């Protein structure tokens, strides 16, 4: 009889270990909503700022015409070309637009340009694009005294 009681107790202990408790059967999950995350990439659908060249090579321009708009220096002002406060290039005189690639030697007072030049390899030459306006009328004409 003692053996039967021991077997019955171990069987009920094993069943109690394997079967889930009754309290878990009564637990109910209610509807819930997760909190929304924040979006990081706002403003990606804004239109472009329309930077770029306004007058191409060979175009005739009047004084004050905008030649190019830029955010950073992509084109540098050359002869008869002014630089606006927002880095736009404009014509100072009437004439024809010309673009050239020239060797760029920055002034020693410009620390950013000096840092760039010091990082270049030995013997490297720095070229930049310059915008010029060739005046339509000659600036100064002179005659030799012998021709008078």
From Swiss-Prot:
<comment type="subunit">
    <text>Component of the mitochondrial ribosome large subunit (39S) which comprises a 16S rRNA and about 50 distinct proteins.</text>
</comment>
<dbReference type="GO" id="GO:0003735">
    <property type="term" value="F:structural constituent of ribosome"/>
</dbReference>
<dbReference type="GO" id="GO:0005743">
    <property type="term" value="C:mitochondrial inner membrane"/>
</dbReference>
<keyword id="KW-0687">Ribonucleoprotein</keyword>
<dbReference type="Pfam" id="PF01016">
    <property type="entry name" value="Ribosomal_L27"/>
</dbReference>
<protein>
    <recommendedName>
        <fullName>Large ribosomal subunit protein bL27m</fullName>
    </recommendedName>
</protein>
<keyword id="KW-0689">Ribosomal protein</keyword>
<dbReference type="GO" id="GO:0006412">
    <property type="term" value="P:translation"/>
</dbReference>
<feature type="transit peptide" description="Mitochondrion">
    <location>
        <begin position="1"/>
        <end position="30"/>
    </location>
</feature>
<dbReference type="GO" id="GO:0005762">
    <property type="term" value="C:mitochondrial large ribosomal subunit"/>
</dbReference>
<keyword id="KW-0496">Mitochondrion</keyword>
<keyword id="KW-0809">Transit peptide</keyword>
<dbReference type="InterPro" id="IPR001684">
    <property type="entry name" value="Ribosomal_bL27"/>
</dbReference>
<comment type="similarity">
    <text>Belongs to the bacterial ribosomal protein bL27 family.</text>
</comment>
């Amino acid at each position: 009889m003692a053996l039967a009681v021991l077997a019955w107790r171990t069987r009920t202990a094993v069943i109690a270990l394997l079967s889930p408790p009754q309290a878990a059967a009564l637990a109910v999950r209610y509807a819930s909503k997760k909190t929304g995350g924040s979006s990081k990439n706002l403003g990606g659908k804004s239109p472009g700022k329309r930077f770029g060249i306004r007058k191409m090579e060979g175009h005739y321009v009047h004084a004050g015409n905008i030649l190019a708009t830029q955010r950073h220096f992509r084109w540098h002002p050359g002869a008869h070309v002014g630089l606006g406060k927002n880095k736009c290039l404009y014509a100072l005189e009437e004439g024809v637009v010309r673009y050239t690639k020239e060797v760029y030697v920055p002034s020693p007072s410009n620390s950013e340009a000096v840092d760039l030049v010091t990082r270049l390899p030995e013997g490297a030459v720095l070229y930049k694009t310059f915008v010029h306006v060739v005046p339509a009328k000659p600036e100064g004409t002179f005659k030799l005294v012998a021709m008078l």
